[in-house]
Amino acid sequence: MAQPYPPAQYPPPPQNGIPAEYAPPPPHPTQDYSGQTPVPPEHGMTLYTPAQTHPEQPGTEASTQPIAGTQTVPQADEAAQTDNQQLHPSDPTEKQQPKRLHVSNIPFRFRDPDLRQMFGQFGKILDVEIIFNERGSKGFGFVTFETSSDADRAREKLNGTIVEGRKIEVNNATARVMTNKKPGNPYANGWKLNPVVGTVYGPEFYAVTSFPYPTTGTAVAYRGAHLRGRGRAVYNTFRAAPPPPPIPTYGAALEQTLVKMPVPWAGLAPCPLPPQQTPEPAYPTSPAFPPLSCPFASRVVYQDGFYGAEIYGGYAAYRYAQPAAATAAAYSDSYGRVYAAADPYHHTIGPTATYSIGTMASLCRGGYSRFTPY
């Protein structure tokens, strides 16, 4: 009875570049048959009889394996040879590239010819550069060789040598690293002041629309000026300016009292002002200006807007706008407290000390700029 053939098995696709005809055959079920003539190992295939099938000989795989091996080894050799051929021509190219060396701790009297003479014995030098500042040499420089092989040889020979009592160091120069630039000046007009002092003395403070003094033109003229000494030049310019016209938001007499009087503090009592029938003169020394019945009238101080009208003007205007008659029934202050009579401390508080502009500026700087070194 004939044995049925096993199902046909096709060889797998070629792998690793090995042709399909040299791939090992698929495994077959091994059966033991007697009376069959063994096939010589040199044959690469198994002979089948019509009645019986012969098992696959062990020598078949052995005969096919060397064939596959003999095909792969030359391919690996060819690939290695190709890689070597690609690497060897590139080595001379790399050696021909220029290379830069960093030389540090050189004597301060060294100049470019001295450094060129020191390194010139090792090969052709393309460039020599010693770094200087305003005081002279900084003690290091750069030497650029035409070939990297000469640069490596110079680095090996000269690194650590003693030159005029100084041990020089020669290393490969690294790529230049661009450090972050310093942040730009926050003031567009070039003022280099801290925020507190810049707020007090900066021209922008006097150029805002809420400031009642017409100093915009003066501020624009001084815009961009690099100041010294706390911006005193521009500050003195504002002080030397003629007295400004009356504040638009307050009455003329009230403006003179607020601006040309000492700084009114919260505890000061209101000074009654006499009614004025004639137009207000430009200066208090005019004969047409009626005398004030206020104890402060003898002390006339021209206050800047920062210390007088702008900061304390709101509260002072409120206090001075109260009725001048002492028989007022009741009045309230800015905190909502209602008083049935005049301020009980009206006659106990005398005139405050008059501070000059420089003293007030010093007080402001000392109080709010405690971290300023001077």
UniProtKB/Swiss-Prot annotation:
Chief location bin: nucleus
Organism phylogeny: Eukaryota, Metazoa, Chordata, Craniata, Vertebrata
Domain of life: Eukaryota
InterPro entries found in the cross-reference section: Fox-1_C_dom (IPR025670), FOX1_RRM (IPR034237), Nucleotide-bd_a/b_plait_sf (IPR012677), RBD_domain_sf (IPR035979), RBFOX1-3 (IPR017325), RBFOX1-like (IPR047131), RRM_dom (IPR000504)
GO molecular function: DNA binding; RNA binding
GO biological process terms held by the UniProt record: mRNA processing; nervous system development; regulation of alternative mRNA splicing, via spliceosome; RNA splicing
Disordered: annotated span: 1-105
Site (Interaction with RNA): 100, 108-109, 133, 138, 142, 166, 176
Annotated Polar residues bias: 49-74
Skewed-composition ranges (Pro residues): 1-29
Cited Pfam families: Fox-1_C, RRM_1
Inducing factors: By retinoic acid. Expression is up-regulated in P19 cells during neural differentiation upon retinoic acid treatment (at the protein level).
PTM per Swiss-Prot/TrEMBL: Phosphorylated.
Positions bearing Asymmetric dimethylarginine: 223, 319
PROSITE patterns xrefs: RRM
UniProt keywords, alphabetically: Cytoplasm, Methylation, mRNA processing, mRNA splicing, Nucleus, RNA-binding
Residue positions where Omega-N-methylarginine is found in the record: 223
Summary of the function given for this chain in its UniProt record: Pre-mRNA alternative splicing regulator. Regulates alternative splicing of RBFOX2 to enhance the production of mRNA species that are targeted for nonsense-mediated decay (NMD).
Subcellular location: Nucleus; Cytoplasm
Organism in which the protein naturally occurs: Mus musculus
Protein name: RNA binding protein fox-1 homolog 3
